[in-house]
């Protein structure tokens, strides 16, 4: 496919008048001295170009998207319409009096998320999951500083979400990793062995990135709190537990949620996202400002939090994402519980269908996702997990997350979400079985995949280390 620059040779987009425009009033330092080298195409050619680009992409509306730990569920299109209503298209610096509708929505979303998590206070400002993580860890850091305790360590299980170590490190903590037990859960003895007065918190995902529920979470909570430490809940996998349990019940002190995952706002390609952070009562004054409050007469932005960590983002978060998430919650109501039920059901169905054909390192009941391994295929025929992922692209399926979590060799992390019906799941099972059989009988066919995509094999190392981002003649 040609770039838009290559398509512009010999064409014009807009023909400007020949009349000279006086630009003498412009300062010399803002006047361009060289050609812009911008492409020029007709409107029709521009439309065709971007339509062609869109046809090269894969999206949830096109086919199955079982990207583990990403919750690529269907995003109701009516929510896009609601987020574009004129009343929400206001400047973030308008006064509270002129933003009552937007502030009311934010207040109601705060209340809804607090009810779902049973936490006590919340901020909507963080704009991504990892941003929420860092916000939560900054709250924990300031809490201990304010009570005069110099705690320097954060415990992170090897089954935690991938961005947890970076978030804790960027907040000034040292990382202490603990290994999982034979069931793929936090090893209590390993936790006890590293738990001392230097430990500020533990960061956990429950269910963890193996898709396994941490059945000893109450014991972990007791041990941490007896040590004066806090528990951080990464909400990456919250789609598995809505209506059945919640972070407060499990003993967590700080929670972040991914609205772009659990609450069905479009994501991928870098955003947009939202990672609200909720806390227990003793931490509410540490939240970033402002939070939205209500005095019985009007909604207002509250900056009066005496121990606040300050602002973590300009303005008040990714507002359009908040609108879509709130619309989703209203649409689903009590059926949020059924969303989790079906997500767990779909994952267990796939796991049972596929474990005969691929290794299953932790054969435990899973929640919303599960992790297979391509070790068998690699050992028998040299077909790696990466090759399996490439072959899936020929079956109108987005590859699952691969090589994560790191504790599973040749990992294949599959999350079907609640959106998919049995026929789609069966098609995926059939494709995965076919790949496993072909890997045995004709491995070269899998090793050379994909065969039907517009772009075949690419040099991923070259693309990552030396990206070519600029067009030149």
Locations of the language-model features?
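Non-catalytic terminal extensions of PLP-dependent enzymes
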Residues: 1-120, 245, 295, 299-312, ...
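Conserved phosphate/anionic-ligand binding catalytic regions in large, soluble enzymes, centered on
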Residues: 58-78, 125-133, 263-278, 316-327, ...
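Short, flexible loop/turn elements at secondary-structure junctions
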Residues: 71, 128, 160, 208, ...
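Conserved PLP-enzyme active-site core in the AAT-like
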Residues: 101-104, 131-299, 307, 382-383, ...
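Long, K/E/R/D-enriched contiguous segments that form extended
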Residues: 110-111, 117-120, 125-136
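Short, well-ordered loop/turn and helix-capping segments at boundaries between secondary-structure elements
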Residues: 142, 146, 170, 197, ...
């Amino acid at each position: 496919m040609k770039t838009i620059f290559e398509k512009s040779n010999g064409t014009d987009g807009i023909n400007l008048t020949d009349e000279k425009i006086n630009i003498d009033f412009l300062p010399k330092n803002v006047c361009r001295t060289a050609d812009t080298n911008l492409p020029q195409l007709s409107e029709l050619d521009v439309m065709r170009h971007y339509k062609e680009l869109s046809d090269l992409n894969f999206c949830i509306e096109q086919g199955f998207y079982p990207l583990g730990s990403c919750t690529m569920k269907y995003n109701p299109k009516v929510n896009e319409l609601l987020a574009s209503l004129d009343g929400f298209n206001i400047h973030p610096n308008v006064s509270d009096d002129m933003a009552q509708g937007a502030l009311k929505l934010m207040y109601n979303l705060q209340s809804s998320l607090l009810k779902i998590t049973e936490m006590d206070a919340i901020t909507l400002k963080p704009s991504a999951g990892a941003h929420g993580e860092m916000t939560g860890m900054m709250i924990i850091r300031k809490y201990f500083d304010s009570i005069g305790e110099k705690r320097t360590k954060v415990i992170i299980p090897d089954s935690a979400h991938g961005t947890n170590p970076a978030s804790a490190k960027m907040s000034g903590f040292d990382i202490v990793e603990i290994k999982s037990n034979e069931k793929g859960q936090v090893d209590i003895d390993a936790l006890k062995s590293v738990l001392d007065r230097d430990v500020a918190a533990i960061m956990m995902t429950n269910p963890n990135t193996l898709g396994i529920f941490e059945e000893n979470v109450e014991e972990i909570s007791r041990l941490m709190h007896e040590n004066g430490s806090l528990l951080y809940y990464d909400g990456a996998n919250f789609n598995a537990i809505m209506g059945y349990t919640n972070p407060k019940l499990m003993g967590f002190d700080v929670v972040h949620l991914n609205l772009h995952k659990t609450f069905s706002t479009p994501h991928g390609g870098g955003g947009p996202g939202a990672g609200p952070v909720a806390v227990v009562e003793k931490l509410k004054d540490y939240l970033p400002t402002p939070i939205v409050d209500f005095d019985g007469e009007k909604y207002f932005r509250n900056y009066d939090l005496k121990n606040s960590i300050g602002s973590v983002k300009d303005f008040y978060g990714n507002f359009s994402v908040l609108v879509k998430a709130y619309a989703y919650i209203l649409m689903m109501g009590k059926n949020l519980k059924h969303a989790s039920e079906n997500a767990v059901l779909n994952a267990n169905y796939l796991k049972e269908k596929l474990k005969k054909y691929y290794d299953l390192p932790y054969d435990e009941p899973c929640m919303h996702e599960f992790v297979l391994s391509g070790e068998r295929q690699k050992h028998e025929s040299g077909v790696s997990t990466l090759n399996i992922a490439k072959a899936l692209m020929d079956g109108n399926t987005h590859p699952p997350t691969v090589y994560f979590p790191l504790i599973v060799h040749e990992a294949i992390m599959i999350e079907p979400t609640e959106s998919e019906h049995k026929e789609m799941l069966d098609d995926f099972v059939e494709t995965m079985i076919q790949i496993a059989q072909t890997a045995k009988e004709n491995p070269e066919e899998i090793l050379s995949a994909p065969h039907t995509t517009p772009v075949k094999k690419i040099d991923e190392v070259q693309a990552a280390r030396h990206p070519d981002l600029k067009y030149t003649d």
